[in-house]
Every structure is written in structure tokens, then in C-alpha cells.
């Protein structure tokens, strides 16, 4: 065994784990609410009714008046549950803001980047925890699994998918931030132009590769 191949493992502190638990609990509620909203829309569509276009946060307010009479016994409890989940998500949002103000003020600096909000900045700070353990900033991209796999045969070097190592929640949040930066509402910036140059190369999944590249730059 060559000891030089080994690397030390740094465990997260109990306080960091507790703060991450708040973010992961919120993420579970957000995904649950999305599934409930999609289910309600699907049930109504089967009877020829469409709910108005709106955000998931406002769905419980705008949907009730459009529920078909035949579906009210089935959808009314779900709409009440969506409302309760929305209230709980807002409570988690306030808790996240309190954690940032009390323990992680550096997140406010991270939020200066367009598309990066409280949840993404705090998740990044908690997952990285100690930036000094990385020798260079490029190592962070590999740490959260946003660098391509390698498979060199000598004759060819195929382009493979990213490794998807590390924390999946942080990786998803960074990709969402990158999607906003590259989207129609994202203002002009170095990150946006960087992603547009990659997308302009064309090829299969060019837009998807550009979002991943911008997310890696964010990290």
C-alpha cells in the first residue's frame, strides 16, 4: 500500500449537520408540494379542466375555484395539505435567514452573484465548511462531482458525463442558479457570457453542458 494515495477525511461538525438538516427538510417539503400540485393538475386535466398558470406557492389560493364539482372530495384535502406545506416552507425560509445572520454572514457575499439566494449560499457554506482544506478553487468542482469522468484508452478520449460525486443537493442548487444566469431573466455578466460561449459550440446537449459549466464556475 502506498500511503501517498490516501487522503484524510474531514467530518462535518454537529452544528453544521443540524443546519443542513433544516435545508434538507425544506427541500423535502418543496419536492412534496411539487408532486401534489402536478397530481392535482393531472386529475383535473383528465376531466377537461385546466388550472390557471401560477407558481406552486400560490397554487392553493388560485386552484379551488377551478376544481370540478366531481373532484372536490378528492382534491380539497390535497389543496389544504399544499397550503400547510407552503406555510411550513416559509417558516423554514425564515429559519435559514436567521442561521445566515447569526452564524454564516459570509453567505451575504455569495448572494451578490445573480441567481444565488439564501438556500444555495448557505448550503454551499455548510457543505464546504472549511475552504482552507482545498489547495485550489478548481478542486471544489471535483469535490461536488461536477467534472467529467475520464476514460483514456490511448487512441481516444471520449467526452463522458460528470462524476456526480459529493452532495447531490448542492449540485442541484448550483445547476438551478446557473439555469437562471443563462435564462431569459439573467442579466449580462462574465458567467453568462462564459456559458453562452460553451452553448455556441453546438453539438448534442450544448445548453445542458453550458449550465453544468457555469455551475462548476460558481463552485
Question: Locations of the language-model features?
Answer:
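Residue-level detector of well-ordered alpha-helical segments, enriched
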Residues: 32, 36-39, 120, 136, ...
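Glycine-rich, often acidic, oxyanion-interacting loops/wings at catalytic, nucleic-acid
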Residues: 14, 18-109, 190
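Short helix-capping/linker segments at secondary-structure and domain boundaries
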Residues: 3-7, 36-37, 89, 129-133, ...
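Short alpha-helix plus adjacent loop in nuclease-associated cores
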Residues: 1-11, 17, 58-67, 154-165, ...
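Charged substrate- and nucleic-acid-binding regions of tRNA-handling and nucleotidyl-transfer enzymes
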Residues: 202-219
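Phosphate-backbone recognition surface of nucleic-acid-processing proteins
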Residues: 109-112, 118-207
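Short coil/turn segments at secondary-structure boundaries
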Residues: 9-12, 42-45, 53-58, 153-156, ...
